[in-house]
């Protein structure tokens, strides 16, 4: 009787010689239980891709090798650790010597033994339990979705964790998975070397704020060709680099130019000499420690001559600007006669006023304050005595 057995990856045709109906029924029920357990395990391990590939691959391999070992072994097999097969094979209906090969011919036995040298009978009872089972995480609230414009690159920590989780399964994964794992390890090493260098992704340039840069000024920066020097009293610098010494006179504040010098110290020394000549010991000097040098020397003679010439020039200008006294007046004889007549007329008027005053005083009226002969002014100036 030919019975097809369907699996996930292949179709196996098994020729079974039925010796006893109970054995066949037990075999079918055990296979159905095994397929149901595999379906539930696949649903649970849907999130982990690599363990799913590994278990499906290993179960298919074990299934095929178990069928061939079941057909070729001379001892009662243990297919995938199901105890029903062992109990069925221990049935008293089957003699041990009458079945050297259970379901196949000697030619098929040699073929299967050459393909699979190790029988399934050597597989332990808890073979599947020896594999590390993936722990199902507890149900946690789902994280909010990432709504950025760009995909996130895998972090180095996550890659190392996934590598450590996959390390127990490396011995069960075929060569194709080993090659992909090696490629991934190379990529991790490259990523480790790249993390030492500062890098920016396209998203950083897209979403980062632009930095403000100061505008370039069009005005030229003035380069100081001369070193900053100390400023002295009465000293200033020309725009071509020379130094000038000047002083003001104490009375009229007139500025006196003392000369042009090569250095600021020479100009300050000239100012000190002029200040000492004009003010003496009360002068404010740039170099008070060098006061003894100001009393003698060619510089003192030169500056003294400059000051004297300037003072003489100022005094001469003041004399020329002052007005000359008016000349004495010489009168003619006609002017003298006219002057005598004026004086005689004034004397007559004074005599008349005195006589008129005496007459008024005799009548009891005060006319001492009478300014003129105007009647309005006379009545305003009069003051009558109070009646008793």
From Swiss-Prot:
Region (Disordered): 314-366
Main localisation: nucleus
One Pfam family here: AP2
Gene Ontology cellular component terms for the protein in this record: nucleus
PROSITE patterns: AP2_ERF (PS51032)
Superkingdom of this protein's organism: Eukaryota
Molecular function GO labels: DNA-binding transcription factor activity; transcription cis-regulatory region binding
Biased composition (Basic and acidic residues): 335-360
DNA-binding region: 231-288
InterPro entries in the record: AP2/ERF_dom, AP2/ERF_dom_sf, DNA-bd_dom_sf, ERF/AP2-like
Keyword tags: Activator, DNA-binding, Ethylene signaling pathway, Nucleus, Transcription, Transcription regulation
UniProt subcellular location: Nucleus
Gene Ontology biological process terms in this record: ethylene-activated signaling pathway
Keyword Disulfide bond: no
Keyword Cell inner membrane: no
CDD domains: AP2 (cd00018)
Function: Probably acts as a transcriptional activator. Binds to the GCC-box pathogenesis-related promoter element. May be involved in the regulation of gene expression by stress factors and by components of stress signal transduction pathways.
Entry similarity comment: Belongs to the AP2/ERF transcription factor family. ERF subfamily.
Protein name: Ethylene-responsive transcription factor ERF062
Organism: Arabidopsis thaliana
